[in-house]
C-alpha cells in the first residue's frame, strides 16, 4: 500500500509512490502472448539534445493518454521509447564543450530518460535503444549492402553546399546569406560522389499508397502528393550545334506542356551541365559565371527566390518542329540534379522564363489563347506584362502561331505531338516525378558508417555481412574541420574483401533520416539478430503515430519508403508502417524584449516578466521583475531558444507536479492546434487537482458508502447519476474516436462541479457520489495517472494498476429521464418551458403547453391551427 498523506494533495509524494509501484511491477512491459487485440502507439523518437521542451511534453502526453486509454479498453498496448542519437548537434556540442560527441550524447540520454520517467509515461523501457549504438546500426548497414547488390543503392556525383573552411558539406538551412553558418566562409557548390537510394523506383507506389491511409491527415497526404509530384508529359529531343555548326550531344527535355512547343525561343541548362562546361572552355566570361554560380543555392526553394541570372553559351538547339536554331543559355534556376538538367524555355507561357527573357531581351511569342475569354483583359496578350492566364491549363485553350497545330486544344496537341515524335524517334510519352532519389551520404563523423570499401582494382565493394558492423570509433578528438575518421589511417585503411589488396573504407556516414526510417519496426523486436523478427508482424503496422506536421515530407516519406524496402526483403508483411497519424500543433508562448544597442532585440524569458493589467483584466504592459522597468510585448510565437520564450518542463513539474503539467497540456487546446502556454492556466489546473483530491477525501471521511440501489433513487440522485453516465459516454468518445482531450477534461470538470452542489448525505446519495467519484478517477487516469492511482486507493479499491481496470461504460438505463423539460414556442418563438413525464401522452403535452402562463398570454385571441412536437425537445404551437 502506498503512503499518501490524506486530505493534502502533495503531487510529488503521490507521483513518487505511483512510479515506484509501476517500476516494481513492470507495469508497462508487454509481450506478444496476450489474447487481447494489439495496439501499437508511439511518438516520434526524440533527439537527445540535453533537455525536454514543452513540445516534447505535449507530444508524449498525447500518445500516453491514448496508450493508457487503450489499455483500459482491453488492448495489449506497446508504447516504446528510444533516441535518435546521431546528428550534427552532437558535433557542434563536441566542439563547444571539447568533448567527444558520444560522451555528450549518452549523458543527455541519461538526463532526458529521467525527465521522461518523472512525467509518468506508460513506456515499455525494456525496448529502449539509441540509434548510435552498433547493435542498432549494424542492421541498416546490412540492409544497405543488400540494396547495393540489388541495384537499389548506387553512387554518383551530386552537387552539394561545400564549406571550404570547415571542409564539410552543409545542409541548405546551414547556408545563411551565401555563407557557412559557423565558419562564415563563402559557400561553394561542389560536385562530389554521393550514395543514393532509388526511392524513385517506388514513386508510384508511394503515391498510390496515400489513398489507403485513411487515418492520416489530408494535409500531410497532400504535401506528400505534391512532393512526389507525378506529372505526365513528353520527353523531347533537341539536336545541338556548336558555334561552328558541328553537332554535339543532343539535349532531352521533359515538358508537361507540349502544346506550347512552338513558343520555345531558347533552351535553359544548369551551370553544371556538360554542355555548359564544354562551352566555357572557349568562353572565359561564361567560365567566370559558372564559377560564380557555384556559390548559389542548390535547393528548389532557393532557386525560386533568388535573382534570375544567366548567359548565352554560344551553342544553339534545333527546334524539333520548325528546324529553327534557338540559343542555349545557362540559367541559375535550372538544377542539374532535377530531370535532365535542361528545360525548353517558353517565355510566353511560363512566368520564370518570361522574367528571364525580359531581363535578357530574348524573344517572347504567344502560341496559346483562351477559347472563351471572360473579359477584355483576357483577350489581350502583352510580352511586357505577365498575366496568370498565359499559363492556365485549367481553362479551355487553343493553339495559335503553331503551324499545322493551330486550333488544337491541349489534349489534341498533346496526342498529335506525341504521335509525331514517337514515330520519328525524337521523343516519347513519359511519366515524370518531382521526387528525387534519396542522397544518404553525409560528410560528417557522428553518424552510421557507410559499409563500403574502395579498392583500386575492384571499385566500390560492400563490406561482407560477417564483417559487420563497421563500428564508428567513439573516443575521438573532435575539431572544427573535417572528420576524425577521415584523418585516422588505422580506421580508414583496410583490405579489399574481393581481392585482398590494400583498400580504404568509405568515410562518409549515413543521413540520420536512415536511422529514423525503420526504428518503429525495431521496437517490436529490439533484441532480434536480424533487423526484425516475426514479432514485427504482430505489432506492425503501428496503430497511432504522433508527431509534428513539419515531418510530413522528409521523415514520413523516407519512413514509408524504407518500410517497403523491408517488406520486399521479406522482413515485414505490411505495406505501410503506420495506420493512423496524429500531427500535434506547436506550443507557443508570449515573447518579451528590449531594444538592443546594436539595433536588434534582447529577448527576455516570460518567467522574468510581470504582466500589468487594468481593472478589467486586459493587458496594459509588462515590466522586468529584476528592475521594474517596462519591456516590449512581442506577441505569441513558437517556443524557441532564439526568442527565449521556452518554459522548462522540469521546473513546471517541480512546481506543480507531473499530473498538473500533463492536464494543462491536454486541456489548453485540441491536439492538432497550437497550444498557448499560460501559467495562469496551469494554476487553474492545479486548483482543479486540489479540489478533486479534497472531494474524494471529504466523501471518504464521512464513512463507507453503501451499495447503490438504482430502484430506490430520488429524482435528484437520478439526475446526478445521469450526469455521471453522460460524462462517461462523452469522455469515451473524446478519447477513443475524436482524440479531443480538452473536451473530455471539461466534461469531467462539469461533473465535479455538479457533484460539489449535490449535498445529499443519505445512504443512496453517498452511493451515487461514490459511483461518480470512482468514474471521475478512472476517466482522468489516462491524463493524471498518478493522482488516479492514489485516489483509487482512497476510495477503498486497493492499490492496483488502473490500466487493468476496465474503462467505465455508460449505463444506458441511467440516461433515461423520468421527466423532460420541453421548450414551448408560439409560431417558432420561444415563450416558455414545461416539465412533463418522460412517458406523457401527446394530448397531455399539448394541454400543458397551451396552459403554460406566458404561452397562454401570447395565444390569447388566436386560434390554434397545429401543434408540432419534437420529442424530448420542443412544442411549437402554430396559431393565427
UniProtKB/Swiss-Prot annotation:
<dbReference type="GO" id="GO:0005524">
    <property type="term" value="F:ATP binding"/>
</dbReference>
<dbReference type="Pfam" id="PF09334">
    <property type="entry name" value="tRNA-synt_1g"/>
</dbReference>
<dbReference type="InterPro" id="IPR001412">
    <property type="entry name" value="aa-tRNA-synth_I_CS"/>
</dbReference>
<dbReference type="Pfam" id="PF00133">
    <property type="entry name" value="tRNA-synt_1"/>
</dbReference>
<feature type="short sequence motif" description="'KMSKS' region">
    <location>
        <begin position="638"/>
        <end position="642"/>
    </location>
</feature>
<dbReference type="InterPro" id="IPR014729">
    <property type="entry name" value="Rossmann-like_a/b/a_fold"/>
</dbReference>
<dbReference type="InterPro" id="IPR002300">
    <property type="entry name" value="aa-tRNA-synth_Ia"/>
</dbReference>
<dbReference type="InterPro" id="IPR009080">
    <property type="entry name" value="tRNAsynth_Ia_anticodon-bd"/>
</dbReference>
<keyword id="KW-0547">Nucleotide-binding</keyword>
<dbReference type="GO" id="GO:0002161">
    <property type="term" value="F:aminoacyl-tRNA deacylase activity"/>
</dbReference>
<dbReference type="Pfam" id="PF08264">
    <property type="entry name" value="Anticodon_1"/>
</dbReference>
<keyword id="KW-0963">Cytoplasm</keyword>
<dbReference type="InterPro" id="IPR015413">
    <property type="entry name" value="Methionyl/Leucyl_tRNA_Synth"/>
</dbReference>
<dbReference type="InterPro" id="IPR009008">
    <property type="entry name" value="Val/Leu/Ile-tRNA-synth_edit"/>
</dbReference>
<keyword id="KW-0648">Protein biosynthesis</keyword>
<keyword id="KW-0030">Aminoacyl-tRNA synthetase</keyword>
<dbReference type="InterPro" id="IPR025709">
    <property type="entry name" value="Leu_tRNA-synth_edit"/>
</dbReference>
<dbReference type="InterPro" id="IPR002302">
    <property type="entry name" value="Leu-tRNA-ligase"/>
</dbReference>
<comment type="similarity">
    <text>Belongs to the class-I aminoacyl-tRNA synthetase family.</text>
</comment>
<protein>
    <recommendedName>
        <fullName>Leucine--tRNA ligase</fullName>
        <ecNumber>6.1.1.4</ecNumber>
    </recommendedName>
</protein>
<dbReference type="GO" id="GO:0004823">
    <property type="term" value="F:leucine-tRNA ligase activity"/>
</dbReference>
<dbReference type="GO" id="GO:0005829">
    <property type="term" value="C:cytosol"/>
</dbReference>
<dbReference type="Pfam" id="PF13603">
    <property type="entry name" value="tRNA-synt_1_2"/>
</dbReference>
<keyword id="KW-0436">Ligase</keyword>
<keyword id="KW-0067">ATP-binding</keyword>
<feature type="binding site">
    <location>
        <position position="641"/>
    </location>
    <ligand>
        <name>ATP</name>
    </ligand>
</feature>
<dbReference type="GO" id="GO:0006429">
    <property type="term" value="P:leucyl-tRNA aminoacylation"/>
</dbReference>
<dbReference type="InterPro" id="IPR013155">
    <property type="entry name" value="M/V/L/I-tRNA-synth_anticd-bd"/>
</dbReference>
<feature type="short sequence motif" description="'HIGH' region">
    <location>
        <begin position="46"/>
        <end position="56"/>
    </location>
</feature>
Amino acid at each position: 500500500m502506498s503512503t499518501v498523506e490524506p486530505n493534502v494533495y502533495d503531487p510529488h509524494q503521490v507521483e513518487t509512490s505511483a512510479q515506484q509501484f509501476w517500476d516494481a511491477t513492470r507495469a508497462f512491459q508487454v509481450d506478444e502472448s496476450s489474447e487481447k487485440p494489439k495496439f501499437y502507439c508511439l511518438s516520434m523518437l526524440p533527439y537527445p539534445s540535453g533537455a525536454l521542451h514543452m513540445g516534447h511534453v505535449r507530444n508524449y502526453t498525447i500518445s500516453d493518454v491514448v496508450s493508457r486509454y487503450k489499455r483500459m479498453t482491453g488492448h495489449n498496448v506497446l508504447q516504446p521509447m528510444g533516441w535518435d542519437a546521431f546528428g550534427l548537434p552532437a558535433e557542434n556540442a563536441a566542439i563547444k564543450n571539447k568533448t567527444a560527441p558520444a560522451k555528450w550524447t549518452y549523458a543527455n540520454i541519461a538526463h532526458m530518460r529521467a525527465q521522461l520517467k518523472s512525467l509518468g509515461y506508460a513506456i515499455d523501457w525494456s525496448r529502449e535503444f539509441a540509434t548510435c549504438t552498433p547493435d542498432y546500426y549494424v542492421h541498416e548497414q546490412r540492409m544497405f549492402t543488400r540494396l547495393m547488390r540489388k541495384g537499389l543503392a548506387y553512387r554518383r556525383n551530386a552537387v552539394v553546399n561545400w564549406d571550404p573552411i570547415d571542409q564539410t558539406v552543409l545542409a541548405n538551412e546551414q547556408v545563411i546569406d551565401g555563407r557557412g553558418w559557423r565558419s562564415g566562409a563563402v559557400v561553394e557548390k561542389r560536385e562530389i560522389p554521393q550514395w543514393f537510394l532509388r526511392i524513385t523506383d517506388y514513386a508510384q507506389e508511394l503515391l498510390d499508397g496515400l489513398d489507403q491511409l485513411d487515418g492520416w491527415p489530408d494535409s500531410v497526404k497532400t504535401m506528400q502528393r505534391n512532393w512526389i509530384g507525378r506529372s505526365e508529359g513528353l520527353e523531347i529531343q533537341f539536336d545541338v550545334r556548336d558555334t561552328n555548326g558541328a553537332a554535339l550531344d543532343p539535349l532531352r527535355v521533359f515538358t508537361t506542356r507540349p502544346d506550347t512547343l512552338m513558343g520555345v525561343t531558347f533552351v535553359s541548362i544548369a551551370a553544371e551541365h556538360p554542355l555548359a562546361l564544354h562551352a566555357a572552355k572557349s568562353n572565359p566570361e561564361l567560365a567566370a559565371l559558372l564559377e560564380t554560380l557555384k556559390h548559389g543555392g542548390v535547393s528548389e526553394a532557393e532557386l525560386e527566390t533568388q535573382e534570375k541570372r544567366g548567359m548565352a553559351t554560344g551553342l544553339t538547339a534545333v527546334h524539333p518542329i520548325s528546324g529553327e536554331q534557338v540559343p542555349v543559355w545557362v540559367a541559375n534556376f535550372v538544377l542539374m540534379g532535377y530531370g535532365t538538367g535542361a528545360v525548353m524555355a517558353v517565355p510566353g507561357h511560363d512566368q520564370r522564363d518570361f522574367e528571364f527573357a525580359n531581363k535578357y531581351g530574348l524573344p517572347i511569342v504567344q502560341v496559346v489563347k483562351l477559347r472563351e475569354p471572360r473579359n477584355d483583359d483576357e483577350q489581350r496578350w502583352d510580352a511586357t506584362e505577365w498575366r496568370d492566364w498565359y499559363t492556365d491549363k485549367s481553362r479551355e485553350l487553343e493553339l495559335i502561331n503553331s503551324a499545322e497545330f493551330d486550333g488544337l486544344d491541349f489534349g489534341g496537341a498533346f496526342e498529335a505531338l506525341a504521335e509525331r515524335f514517337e514515330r520519328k524517334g525524337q521523343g516519347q510519352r513519359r511519366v515524370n516525378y518531382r521526387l528525387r532519389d534519396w542522397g544518404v551520404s553525409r560528410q560528417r563523423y557522428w553518424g552510421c558508417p557507410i559499409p563500403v570499401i574502395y579498392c583500386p582494382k575492384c571499385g566500390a565493394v560492400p563490406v561482407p555481412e560477417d564483417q559487420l558492423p563497421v563500428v564508428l570509433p567513439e573516443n575521438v578528438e573532435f575539431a572544427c574541420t573535417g572528420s576524425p575518421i577521415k584523418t585516422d589511417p588505422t580506421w580508414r585503411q583496410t583490405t579489399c574483401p574481393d581481392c585482398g589488396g590494400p583498400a580504404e573504407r568509405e568515410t562518409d556516414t549515413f543521413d540520420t533520416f536512415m536511422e529514423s526510417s525503420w526504428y518503429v519496426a525495431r521496437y517490436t523486436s529490439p533484441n532480434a539478430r536480424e533487423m526484425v523478427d516475426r514479432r514485427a508482424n504482430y505489432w506492425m503496422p503501428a496503430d497511432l503515430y504522433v508527431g509534428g506536421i513539419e515531418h510530413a515530407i522528409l521523415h514520413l516519406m523516407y519512413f514509408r519508403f524504407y518500410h517497403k524496402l523491408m517488406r520486399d526483403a521479406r522482413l515485414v508483411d505490411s505495406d505501410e508502417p503506420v495506420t493512423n497519424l496524429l500531427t500535434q500543433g506547436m506550443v507557443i508562448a508570449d515573447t518579451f524584449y528590449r531594444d538592443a544597442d546594436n539595433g536588434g532585440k534582447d529577448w527576455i524569458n516570460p518567467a522574468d516578466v510581470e504582466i500589468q493589467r487594468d481593472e478589467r483584466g486586459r493587458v496594459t504592459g509588462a515590466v522586468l521583475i529584476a528592475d521594474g522597468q517596462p519591456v516590449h510585448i512581442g506577441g505569441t510565437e513558437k517556443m524557441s531558444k532564439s526568442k527565449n520564450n521556452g518554459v522548462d518542463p522540469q521546473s513546471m513539474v517541480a512546481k506543480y507536479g507531473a499530473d498538473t503539467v500533463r492536464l494543462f497540456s491536454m486541456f489548453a487546446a485540441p491536439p492538432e492546434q497550437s497550444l498557448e502556454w499560460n501559467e495562469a492556466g496551469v494554476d487553474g489546473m492545479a486548483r482543479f487537482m486540489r479540489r478533486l483530491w479534497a472531494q474524494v477525501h471529504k466523501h471518504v471521511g464521512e464513512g463507507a458508502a453503501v451499495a447503490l440501489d438504482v430502484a430506490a433513487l430520488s429524482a435528484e440522485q437520478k439526475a446526478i447519476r445521469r450526469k455521471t453516465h453522460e460524462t462517461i459516454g462523452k469522455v469515451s468518445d473524446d478519447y477513443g474516436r475524436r482524440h479531443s482531450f480538452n473536451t473530455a477534461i471539461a466534461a469531467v470538470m462539469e461533473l465535479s462541479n455538479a457533484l460539489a452542489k449535490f449535498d445529499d448525505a443519505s445512504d443512496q446519495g453517498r452511493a451515487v457520489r461514490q459511483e461518480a467519484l470512482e468514474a471521475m478517477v478512472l476517466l482522468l487516469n489516462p491524463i493524471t495517472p498518478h493522482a488516479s492511482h492514489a485516489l483509487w486507493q482512497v476510495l477503498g479499491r486497493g492499490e492496483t494498476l488502473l490500466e487493468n481496470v476496465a474503462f467505465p461504460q455508460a449505463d444506458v438505463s441511467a440516461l433515461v429521464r423520468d421527466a423532460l423539460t420541453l421548450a414551448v414556442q408560439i409560431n417558432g418563438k420561444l415563450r416558455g418551458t414545461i416539465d412533463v413525464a418522460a412517458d406523457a401522452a401527446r394530448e397531455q403535452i399539448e394541454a400543458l403547453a397551451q396552459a403554460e402562463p406566458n404561452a397562454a398570454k401570447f395565444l390569447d385571441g388566436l386560434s390554434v391551427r397545429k401543434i408540432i412536437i419534437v420529442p424530448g425537445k420542443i412544442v411549437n404551437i402554430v396559431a393565427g
